[in-house]
């Protein structure tokens, strides 16, 4: 289905997305859809997405941060520039240049706490269809916007265990985040998300993890109060060790979604992680991929 407007609730924030010169493929957001006019004020974010065919790229000026990296699974070079905004209405602007191997020549995003404008210049036939939040700059905006509200995004799997506690497992890709989530599912837990979540301060002073729309597959808008953090690695045997303080903040930060990166946002992210995570039992965990690890984790949390 194609549409000119999408409304979705993500991590308790209502997004209103409007398309100009394009249309949206709504499948990635279908499970997060909300009714029109469901929120206002600080709980609402308005996003405009424009398709700019063969338009010149924005001028790069007053660069705060820049980076070059391989872009996702396409193995293409991408350049990122974090610039000062052209107007006091915006917090900052991010400009992305892509290689010709990709579908996009350049893209720009400018944003504030409650508003964003994304412009995309395509160089191949796209039939004018954009999939919101499968596009890298909108994911970066989602990360930035959550940081402005005391939260952060992190590569992780999260399950809600049988006792209602949310368990977050984080590590680099390929370490076993999805594996351990599915092991817990086999022992009675419910998977909230098995790749990436938003963490925000909870109403009770703790923290809550939220599923978000993903690039490759559908998600449901689930959330859970966090009761344990686990920095995982694969091991010939199961072992677990309690961690506290700065070690926890550093480990969470290393797997958070925060690019493009600069000093001001780094300090804000450190504060958000500290506020959300330092009251939650945290552990390094070596595990072998069988059900025995579930008992190891549950026993560790009983003594935490």
List the model feature ranges, each with a label.
Residues 175-177:
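Conserved glycine(s) of the Walker
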Residues 180-181:
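Post-Walker A alpha-helix
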């Amino acid at each position: 289905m194609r549409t000119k407007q999408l409304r979705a609730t993500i991590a308790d924030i209502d997004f209103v997305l409007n398309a100009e010169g394009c249309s949206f493929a709504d499948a990635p957001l279908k499970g997060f859809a909300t009714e029109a006019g469901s929120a206002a004020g600080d709980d609402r974010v308005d996003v405009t997405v424009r398709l700019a065919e063969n338009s010149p790229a924005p001028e790069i000026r007053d660069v705060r941060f820049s980076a070059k990296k391989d872009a996702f699974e396409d193995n293409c070079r991408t350049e990122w520039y974090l610039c000062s905004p052209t107007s006091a209405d915006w917090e900052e602007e991010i400009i992305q240049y892509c290689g010709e191997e990709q579908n996009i020549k350049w893209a720009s995003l400018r944003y504030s706490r409650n508003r964003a404008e994304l412009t995309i210049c395509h160089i191949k036939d796209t039939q004018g269809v954009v999939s919101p939040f499968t596009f890298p700059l909108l994911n970066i905006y989602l990360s930035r916007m959550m940081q402005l509200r005391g939260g952060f995004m992190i590569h992780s799997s999260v399950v809600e265990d049988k006792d209602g506690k949310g368990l977050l497992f984080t590590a680099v890709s390929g370490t076993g985040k999805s594996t351990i989530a599915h092991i817990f599912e086999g022992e009675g837990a419910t998977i909230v998300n098995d790749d990436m979540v938003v963490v925000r301060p909870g109403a009770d002073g703790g923290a809550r993890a939220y599923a978000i729309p993903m690039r490759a597959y559908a998600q449901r808008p689930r959330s859970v109060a966090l009761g344990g953090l686990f920095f995982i690695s694969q091991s010939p045997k199961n072992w677990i060790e309690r961690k506290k303080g700065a070690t926890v903040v550093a480990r969470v930060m290393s797997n958070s979604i925060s690019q493009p990166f600069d000093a001001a946002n780094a300090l804000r992210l450190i504060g958000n992680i500290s506020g959300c995570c330092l009251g939650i039992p945290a552990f390094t965990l070596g595990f072998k991929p069988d059900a025995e690890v579930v008992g190891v984790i549950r026993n560790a949390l009983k003594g935490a």
